[in-house]
UniProtKB/Swiss-Prot annotation:
Name this protein carries in UniProt: Homoserine kinase
Enzyme class: transferase
Phylogenetic classification of the source organism: Bacteria, Pseudomonadati, Pseudomonadota, Gammaproteobacteria, Enterobacterales
Function: Catalyzes the ATP-dependent phosphorylation of L-homoserine to L-homoserine phosphate.
Family membership noted in the UniProt record: Belongs to the GHMP kinase family. Homoserine kinase subfamily.
GO biological process, any: threonine biosynthetic process
Enzyme Commission identifier(s): 2.7.1.39
This protein's pathway: Amino-acid biosynthesis; L-threonine biosynthesis; L-threonine from L-aspartate: step 4/5
UniProt: ATP binding residues: P91, I92, G93, S94, G95, L96, G97, S98, S99, A100, C101
InterPro entries to which the protein is assigned, alphabetical: GHMP_kinase_C_dom, GHMP_kinase_C_sf, GHMP_kinase_N_dom, GHMP_knse_ATP-bd_CS, Homoserine_kinase, Ribosomal_Su5_D2-typ_SF, Ribsml_uS5_D2-typ_fold_subgr
Source organism of the structure: Escherichia fergusonii (strain ATCC 35469 / DSM 13698 / CCUG 18766 / IAM 14443 / JCM 21226 / LMG 7866 / NBRC 102419 / NCTC 12128 / CDC 0568-73)
Gene: thrB
Keyword ATP-binding: yes
Length: 309
């Protein structure tokens, strides 16, 4: 049996709408992501396990893991009889790349099981295609970091889908999922069709400055440039308590904060462990809305998707 783990990811990172994403892993060693298992069988089957399995579609053909298997078989031009298991540990509609976790884990597991017939670029292209079935448009800002690890910048030119941007070891990512669901499609529909020139200029300045600060090793400058004029001003209304939480974490000492993906998860960047702990405690007490909510203190996951022994 092949078992593959795919980590959670935080897309957009305020400054890079649809073009930046980071894979994350809890500092306590726990796994925040999905696991897909593949083993030989006489015919295809799919079993759903894990904390959030009950939230998955009841019809197997609507399950994205089934669609990954179907698409992988199509790519190879043959049916591959396997028994697949999805351990759904990620909440759906959380802003933590839940669908990307399932897509990446499923496709990497199938590729490993079949002896790696597809290279990383082809795999990533198929991942983006399948992610697009859920969110409504092909985009790679969750699947690329989830698959490849680290902080990824979407290029989509010259045969290159994404490339890694150097992160900062001292950054701690406090991720607070309040326990409610925000549909990616709904969060995209709320955005304007056109933007003011001054917002386009500000967005370009922030993103270019952020990438420059990452390469020139200026962590505080990079954090200060993590501002969003494209999505967050419009999406805040979908997230109860977000603006108050953002103000509170800044007062505690977070160097940046924003919406993870399309929400409702909030991310807060801290450069000191004690600050991260205080931010996590405040968010656990004030931002979570039900028993399904959680807070994790994370670092960048530089490994990406990996086979579990």
């Amino acid at each position: 049996m092949v078992r593959v783990y795919a980590p959670a990811s935080s897309a957009n990172m305020s400054v890079g709408f649809d073009v930046l994403g980071a894979a994350v892993t809890p500092i306590d060693g726990s796994l925040l992501g999905d696991v897909v298992g593949v083993e030989a069988a006489d015919s295809f089957s799919l079993q759903n396990l894990g904390r959030f399995a009950s939230k998955l579609p009841s019809k197997p053909r609507e399950n994205i893991v089934y669609q990954c298997w179907e698409r992988f078989c199509q790519e190879l031009g043959k049916q591959i009889p396997v028994a697949m298991t999805l351990e759904k540990n990620m909440p759906i509609g959380s802003g933590l790349g839940s669908s990307a976790c399932s897509v990446v884990a499923a496709l990497v597991a199938m590729n490993e099981y079949c002896g790696k017939p597809l290279n990383d670029t082809r795999l990533l292209a198929i991942m983006g295609e399948l992610e697009g079935r859920i969110s409504g448009s092909i985009h790679y800002d969750n699947v690329a970091p989830c698959f490849l690890g680290g902080m990824q910048l979407m290029i989509e030119e010259n045969g290159i889908i994404s490339q890694q941007v150097p992160g900062f070891d001292e950054w701690l990512w406090v991720l607070a999922y309040p326990g409610i669901k925000v549909s990616t499609a709904e969060a995209r529909a709320i955005l304007p069709a056109q933007y003011r020139r001054q917002d386009c200029i500000a967005h370009g300045r922030h993103l270019a400055g952020f990438i420059h600060a990452c390469y020139s090793r200026q962590p505080l400058l990079a954090a200060k440039l993590m501002k969003d004029v494209i999505a967050e001003p419009y999406r805040e209304r979908l997230l109860p308590g977000f603006s108050q939480a953002r103000q509170a974490v800044a007062e505690i000492g977070a160097v940046a904060s924003g919406i993870s993906g399309s929400g409702p998860t909030l991310f807060a960047l801290c450069d000191k462990p004690d600050t991260a702990q205080r931010v996590a405690e405040w968010l656990a007490k004030n931002y979570l809305q039900n028993q399904e909510g959680f807070v994790h203190i994370c670092r960048l996951d530089t490994a990406g998707a990996r086979v579990l022994e």
